């Protein structure tokens, strides 16, 4: 008996016993008959490859597989079932009897495989027909081993095939009648139908949570960025407003005025002489001091730079506007900014 056939028998038996919810027995599946027809043909073709085939010493009893179709149609379903059941059971007995007469050989191995196929057919018919009392049908005796394999093929193509095609649908319908008890597969099916809804709800919840989390974080970032925009604009405007004032506060020694008052000198303003090393800002009257708050970034007295760095104070500062020139003073045609930037112009101014 081959391993595949043994596994098929075990599968059929477990299916019929452990799962009572399956309505149709294995014999109702047409693939089973087709498989057995192919296997019987392959097994009979292997018989020609055995070198030691001899007639049996004792003839074996085999069922008569020939029948009349007209007579078969007139019989009842119960009679047909008993006839087929009896023929298969008698064939199994003949195969076992023929194998018992042989020792280990190629023919004995093939007869062992044939007995496995006959048992498989008998088990499938038992699941469909139940246990039947075999009637006293027609029998034949044979010594030729080839007749045993041919009897099985003719039985499958004849009586078994007509029984499954004609009476099979009616017998399978009786086996599939619903019972009052609710099968377990139904409850399992209902449970599985509910699972997609729960899964979709869970996915929707997770998506909404992630959307809310992402939306709130993005909103906070936008609000923070929006709050920073006015401050950046204010700083930019302050920097632009402070630029003229810083340009006008050029720290260059020009007649002691740092370029604030063009063409004026401390003598014309009535200020005392400034000793060397002192700051010119201290010598100016209070009404001429520049209107900006002192910053730690301004250089100490006596040290001058061309352009002072931009202040870092966040408070807005008014641009430095010089007071109008004194009409009594003579206006200098040279710009104090250019004089402070170029020492050559400073020398020319002093010479004048």
Swiss-Prot record:
- Give the range the annotation lists for the signal sequence: 1-23
What organism is listed for this UniProt entry?
Answer: Canis lupus familiaris
Q: Give GO MF terms, alphabetically.
A: cytokine activity; hormone activity; signaling receptor binding
Per its record, how is this protein called by name? Answer: Thrombopoietin
The principal localisation class reads secreted
Residues with glycosylation annotation: 185, 197, 206, 234, 255, 332, 347
Q: Which InterPro entries match?
A: 4_helix_cytokine-like_core, EPO/TPO_CS, EPO_TPO, Thrombopoietin
Which GO CC annotations does the UniProt entry carry? extracellular region; extracellular space
Q: Tell me, what does this protein do in biology?
A: Lineage-specific cytokine affecting the proliferation and maturation of megakaryocytes from their committed progenitor cells. It acts at a late stage of megakaryocyte development. It may be the major physiological regulator of circulating platelets.
Lipid biosynthesis found in the keyword field? no
Q: Where is this region: Disordered?
A: 233-259, 292-352
What's a single GO BP term from this record? thrombopoietin-mediated signaling pathway
Write out the annotated subcellular location. Secreted
Annotated disulfide bonds: 28-172, 50-106
Entry text on domains = Two-domain structure with an erythropoietin-like N-terminal and a Ser/Pro/Thr-rich C-terminal.
**Pfam families per the record?**
EPO_TPO (PF00758)
PANTHER family per record: THROMBOPOIETIN
- Comp. bias intervals (Polar residues): 233-245
Q: According to its UniProt record, which protein family does this protein belong to? A: Belongs to the EPO/TPO family.
Report whether Glycoprotein shows up as a keyword of the record.
Answer: yes
Q: Which domain of life is it from?
A: Eukaryota
């Amino acid at each position: 008996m081959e391993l595949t056939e043994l596994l098929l028998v075990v599968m059929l038996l477990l299916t019929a016993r452990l799962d009572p919810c399956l309505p149709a027995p294995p014999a109702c599946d047409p693939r089973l008959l087709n498989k057995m027809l192919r296997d019987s043909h392959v097994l009979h073709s292997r018989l020609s490859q055995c070198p030691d085939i001899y007639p049996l010493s004792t003839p074996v009893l085999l069922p008569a597989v020939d029948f009349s179709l007209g007579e078969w149609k007139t019989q009842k379903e119960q009679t047909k079932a008993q006839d087929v059941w009896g023929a298969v059971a008698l064939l199994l007995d003949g195969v076992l009897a023929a194998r018992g007469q042989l020792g280990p050989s190629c023919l004995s191995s093939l007869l062992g495989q044939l007995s496995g196929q006959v048992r498989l057919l008998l088990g499938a018919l038992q699941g469909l027909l139940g246990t039947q009392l075999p009637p006293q049908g027609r029998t034949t005796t044979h010594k030729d081993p080839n007749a045993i394999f041919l009897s099985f093929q003719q039985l499958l193509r004849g009586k078994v095939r007509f029984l499954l095609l004609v009476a099979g649908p009616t017998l399978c319908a009786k086996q599939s009648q619903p019972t009052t008890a609710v099968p377990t597969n139904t409850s399992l099916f209902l449970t599985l139908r509910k699972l997609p809804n729960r899964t979709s709800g869970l996915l929707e919840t997770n998506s909404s949570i992630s959307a809310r989390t992402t939306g709130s974080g993005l909103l906070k970032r936008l609000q923070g960025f929006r709050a920073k925009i006015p401050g950046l604009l204010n700083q930019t405007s302050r920097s632009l407003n402070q630029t003229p004032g810083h340009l006008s506060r050029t720290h260059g020694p020009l007649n002691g005025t740092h370029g604030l008052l063009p063409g004026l000198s401390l003598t014309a303003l009535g200020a005392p002489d400034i000793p060397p090393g002192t700051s010119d800002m201290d010598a100016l009257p209070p009404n001429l001091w520049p209107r900006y708050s002192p910053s730690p970034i301004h250089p100490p007295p006596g040290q001058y730079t061309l352009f002072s760095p931009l202040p870092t104070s966040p408070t807005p500062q008014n641009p430095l506007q010089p007071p109008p020139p004194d009409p009594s003073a003579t206006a200098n045609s040279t710009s104090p900014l250019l004089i402070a930037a170029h020492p050559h112009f400073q020398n020319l101014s002093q010479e004048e």
